[in-house]
């Protein structure tokens, strides 16, 4: 019965509800006459926080019986798939595609034994390995879910999810040097993402306008509806203001600004990825510095490009709270500094990122893996750079659970 389901999940329900969903649910329950106007206004008026409103709401709905509770469950499943996954709900009270996070026994039994990752030994990554990703053992998966079940992004069932990743790599340019070694990075990142369960789209040698077009098309892919996350990888020359397109020159800039990437994948423009982690990897310089044997992914900083105005920053800050969420960007260097690439071994940053993802995805969340990558750069040498995470709006830990 639906009322029994809500009783069992009451605590997690209260802890997990978001402001947008609680307001929509109140409207739905008013429209379907589960609540009258006075009851709805009382929930809003007498409770200051979302948790208090949720507690008052569920305690009002459960006594009204199974039909009222079923209306509540159906609304959540149809309007907030992330919350439904967190609660282990579906319209018929099954767990659906998401792994149930409500109680540890349900979670642990839902994990199948990890399946072998298929690799091609003839295709080495930039680190020189065979591209093997360590699988997450059943015991390790159980341990993580048991300890952090309410703080982890839910993952969809491996047999039915449709994870997508996009790689955009510019190697050839009209007016600036070729990025020798970029093919090594493409091969390594493609294998890594495939081994983590993503179907990978690779696009090469694009203008800023072409990159925008590809991003828009990617954001509208229907597969995102049945996916739990996405990765986007950009590898090109770069300057402080963004990523260089193939036609870039100091005289005629051809730049994809980082803000455009976030905007095209936010909740407004890509609702299918709402409440799902979106990881952006950027291998590009963000300033200028001389190099000798090693090449640097950098061109001269153009004075023709304007930075966002103060008004734009203020507007963006408001939007972030409502539209931009569940992002993390990992850049190969801090602002104004260079990123290094070897002509035969590929980029230093991409190589170390692949190594660390292969080694630690089985036991660490993405933010912790990125910290380990930064730690590997802690002692500077003649090719010093320091990767940095930016615009992090992940609200939960993103574990990849390779093999599951």
UniProtKB/Swiss-Prot annotation:
GO MF annotations in UniProt: CARD domain binding; cysteine-type endopeptidase activator activity involved in apoptotic process; cysteine-type endopeptidase activity; cytokine binding; endopeptidase activity; identical protein binding; kinase binding
Propeptide: 1-119, 298-316
Disulfides per UniProt: none
Presence of keyword Lipid metabolism: no
Function: Thiol protease involved in a variety of inflammatory processes by proteolytically cleaving other proteins, such as the precursors of the inflammatory cytokines interleukin-1 beta (IL1B) and interleukin 18 (IL18) as well as the pyroptosis inducer Gasdermin-D (GSDMD), into active mature peptides.
Complexes and interactors: Heterotetramer that consists of two anti-parallel arranged heterodimers, each one formed by a 20 kDa (Caspase-1 subunit p20) and a 10 kDa (Caspase-1 subunit p10) subunit. May be a component of the inflammasome, a protein complex which also includes PYCARD, CARD8 and NLRP2 and whose function would be the activation of pro-inflammatory caspases. Component of the AIM2 PANoptosome complex, a multiprotein complex that drives inflammatory cell death (PANoptosis).
Family listed: Belongs to the peptidase C14A family.
Designated name of the protein: Caspase-1
Source species: Homo sapiens
Gene coding for it: CASP1
């Amino acid at each position: 019965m639906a009322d029994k389901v809500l009783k069992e999940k009451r605590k997690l329900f209260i802890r997990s509800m978001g402001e947008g969903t609680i307001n929509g649910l109140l409207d739905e329950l008013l429209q379907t006459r589960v609540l009258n106007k006075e009851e709805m206004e009382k929930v809003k008026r007498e409770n200051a926080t979302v948790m208090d409103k949720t507690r008052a709401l569920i305690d009002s709905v459960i006594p009204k019986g199974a039909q009222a509770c079923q209306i509540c469950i159906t609304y959540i499943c149809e309007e907030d798939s992330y919350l439904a996954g967190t609660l282990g709900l579906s319209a018929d009270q099954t767990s659906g595609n998401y792994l149930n996070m409500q109680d540890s026994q349900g979670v642990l039994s839902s994990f199948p034994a990890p399946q072998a990752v298929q690799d091609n030994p003839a295709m080495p990554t930039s680190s020189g390995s065979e591209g093997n990703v360590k699988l997450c053992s059943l015991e390790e998966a159980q341990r993580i879910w048991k300890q952090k079940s309410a703080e982890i992004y839910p993952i969809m069932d491996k047999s039915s999810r449709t994870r997508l990743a996009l790689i955009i790599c510019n190697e050839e340019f009209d007016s600036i040097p070729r990025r020798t070694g970029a093919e090594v990075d493409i091969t390594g990142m493609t294998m890594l993402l495939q081994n983590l369960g993503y179907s990978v789209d690779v696009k090469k040698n694009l203008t800023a306008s072409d990159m925008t077009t590809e991003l828009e098309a990617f954001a509208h892919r229907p597969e995102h509806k049945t996916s739990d996350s996405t990765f986007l990888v950009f590898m090109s020359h770069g300057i402080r203001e963004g990523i260089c397109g193939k036609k870039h020159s100091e005289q005629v800039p051809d730049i994809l600004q980082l803000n455009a990437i976030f905007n095209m994948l936010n909740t407004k423009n890509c609702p299918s990825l709402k409440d799902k982690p979106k990881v952006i990897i950027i291998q590009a310089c963000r300033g200028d510095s001389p190099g000798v044997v090693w090449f640097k992914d950098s061109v001269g900083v153009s004075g023709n490009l304007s930075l966002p105005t103060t008004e734009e920053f203020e507007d963006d800050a408001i939007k972030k709270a409502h539209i931009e969420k569940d992002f993390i960007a990992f850049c190969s260097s801090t602002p104004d500094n260079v990123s290094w690439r070897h002509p035969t071994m590929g980029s230093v940053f991409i190589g170390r990122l692949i190594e660390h993802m292969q080694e630690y995805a089985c036991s660490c969340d993405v933010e912790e893996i990125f910290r380990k990558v930064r730690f590997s750069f802690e002692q500077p040498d003649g090719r010093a750079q320091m990767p940095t995470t930016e615009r992090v709006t992940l609200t939960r830990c993103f574990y990849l659970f390779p093999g599951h």
